[in-house]
Amino acid sequence: MRFAAFILCFLTVFSGKAQYFTVSGYVADSSRSPIPDVSIFITNGSMVGNTDGSGYYKFDLRSGEYEVVFNHPNYQRVSLKVVLDKKDDTLNVILPELAKSVGEIQITRKWTDPGPEMMRKAIEKKDYWASRFPSSSAEVYIRAFEQYNPPKKKENIWHEPDTALENKKKKKNKDDEPNINMAEILLQRDFQPPGKIKEIRTGVKKIGDVSGLFYLSTTEGDFNFYQNLIRIRGIGDMPVMSPLSGTALLAYKFQFLGSYKNDAGQRILKIKMSPRSISNAVFSGEIHLVDTLFYIYRTELNYPVNQLNEYDKFTMRQEFNLSKDSWLTIEKQRFDYHAAAGKGKFSGYTLVKYNKYELNKTFPKNHFGLEVSSATDSAYDRDSAFWSQKRTTPLNNTEIRFITRTDSIKRVQSSKTYLDSIEKDKNKVTFAKLFFKGQEYQNREKGYYMDFQPMMFIVQPWFPGGTRVTLWNTFERRFKNKRDIRLIENLSYGINNKDIRGTVIFTTTFDPFHRGVFSATAGRDFNFINPNAAFLDLARRGNFYQNTHADVYVRRELINGLYLRVQAEFSERKDISNFTFDGFADSLFENNIPTSFRTNRAFFGNFTLSYTPFQKYIREPRQKVILGSRWPTFSINLNHAIPGVMGSNIDYSYLEYRIEQDFPLGLLGRSEYRIVSGSFMRKNNLSPVDFRYQRRGDPSVFTPPMYAFQTLDSTFVTYKRFIEGHFRHHFNGSLINKIPFMRLLKLRESAGANILYAPERRNMLFYEVYGGIDKLIRIWRDRYKLGIYYAVGYSNLFEKPVVGFKLNFEYFDRRNNSW
């Protein structure tokens, strides 16, 4: 025992004397620029280390006293005494420059920015760190805040009485108050590589109009810079190249800005990034890397301005954390954006905080499916106490005042007294409502809502047969489970022909989650013979007929992505050749003659089945939000007319197939296509109402190219199987932005081609190509495209190609993030 104790004591003393300490720091020149490849020696001449490309060094020595020598051939040697006793030491050294003379010429070593080399090392380790995001579950808190700041009004320089001036100041202060919108979301986010996500929202609070708020769900975008491209449809149409992309060194300029230490004592490298060319779809800003490990510690990046759809400026900040087991997790995100609206400005931010991580979590086999997000039944009913407890980031003063004010207003507005007063005001009959706005009536306790047509719209001069006196009203009942019923009546009296017409429509949403809708319609009104006619032909008398009809319609999602639409209709169709017409319409159209056909009756059923495989969606309480799919949508439509039912004499069957898709093509933009093929399987008896028309092009107007041809010379009917195809590619500036200074104009280019094969028209093969440029235009917060296109079409039946310029107009749908 004594011998063992002696050995243990000896080892303890030996281990204490053999204790090592770390010496680290930076070596720079007199301008504080880092010096790489500095040799470091100690007193006995032993070399203990070198500086890296950023001037950083690190080595270990036993406890004791040393003279450390820093040596570089182009700088003066520096020696420092170091005593290592109880802790590590840090030495930051400046080496004076050593000028070498050759005759009267001084030669000094040129400094090379280490930023590109640092990024090269980060790119080399990209795949490794991309694999270090483990399957995990985390609690995520999201707060989105936005305010509209109206333009400041000019002060009145004229003197006014104190009372009037005070009242005006109060009114001005009230008018100048910012319009604020805000949302808070608490959710559990489950993640499994390489990109599977499932959210469960346990708390949702929305105040004001939240349609313009960004990133209310982590499903809205993946800001993973370990991917080559970052695509966020809510921000812009084009993807942006990641600074860690394999070709980033060709597209980005990197500059080393310095370094700092984080709370864990790690050295963080700050690198500035900017585009090498203004035409590149790349970020600008800063990326912070952890030295030697070269994973992303923090980013602060600006989205390229020319790629923004809705915003004028968009900045994203992210912070990451490395666990003890070398697993990467995202810690927080912040998105700041600004957008002009009129003479005012919208500004907002979204804060996303991740905590309570469970790393390497094992999920059930079918946990990650097509439902990527869902909300609990109580998520939208959380009170202030819940949010006070769950907020991971305190509110600022503006947010506190806003929430306090809105909570107080909500308490008042949810009181029976207030609701009764609002209801009474809406139900009050006034001259302005009767003639201009439209009279309302509601009974909120029973869920009744009624709208009556304003009297200023009673006289309508645009109907076939001349001016008509119209009256329409709407009755609606809404239920708490999102179901509703609606009744719409529309009556009219023709002054010229002294006829009464009208329609009654009943609709109900019987299954909100599966978008189940039932509709029943009955009436006697006008309808289009060819509802897809060219714009100039749509309003001609030859495109109208009288329709006395009754029909029922049901549409519902059967399984996810599979929709069935069934319609049954009985109708009597008459032409309008015996009508008395106004001369005003004759001045608008030449040869404005009604189409004549025999009065007929039709009883038919219409069946449409469409399927989008692997359709992703979000589940709201009693509601479903479709996110889309990477797969095409396949559709089949059968229209079958049955003779002999209640005197019906129309007899035909028409079958049509469709396939359509919209898909991205990286930095080249995105493409979309639509292919349609149809034919009459039986056509024993048809009227012009039942024909399948091929639409002619509109002069000077660029018609939506997925549904129409631009240069087809005439409208005609097809009975046999036809095939039409439409393709369009949106370059979204990827070509035109390469021209100097064009990027500032925010132009978007696109091109496409259409084809039609109609065998019964002497084996007609028609094809056309088009291309053009659109200018992005903003009106308030809405975005539009106004452009000019050039189209060239040719057919084996044409003597020469048909060419022409077209004007294009498109609107950006903020709800679906699409044009």
Regions found by a protein language model. Name each.
Residues 21-23, 29-44, 63:
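Short, ordered, surface-exposed loop/turn motifs in non-cytosolic proteins
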Residues 83-110:
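Extracellular beta-sheet/turn segments enriched in Thr/Pro/Gly and aliphatic residues
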Residues 67-81:
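A short, solvent-exposed loop/turn motif at the edges and junctions
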Residues 239-240, 369-819:
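Exposed, low-structure sequence patches enriched in small/polar residues
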Residues 45-56:
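Short, acidic Ser/Thr/Gly-rich low-complexity loop/linker segments typical of extracellular
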Residues 38-42, 68, 107, 138, ...:
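Hydrophobic beta-strand segments
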Residues 21-29, 55, 93, 107:
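A short, amphipathic beta-strand motif
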Residues 104-268, 274-282, 343-344, 348-460, ...:
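Structured extracytoplasmic
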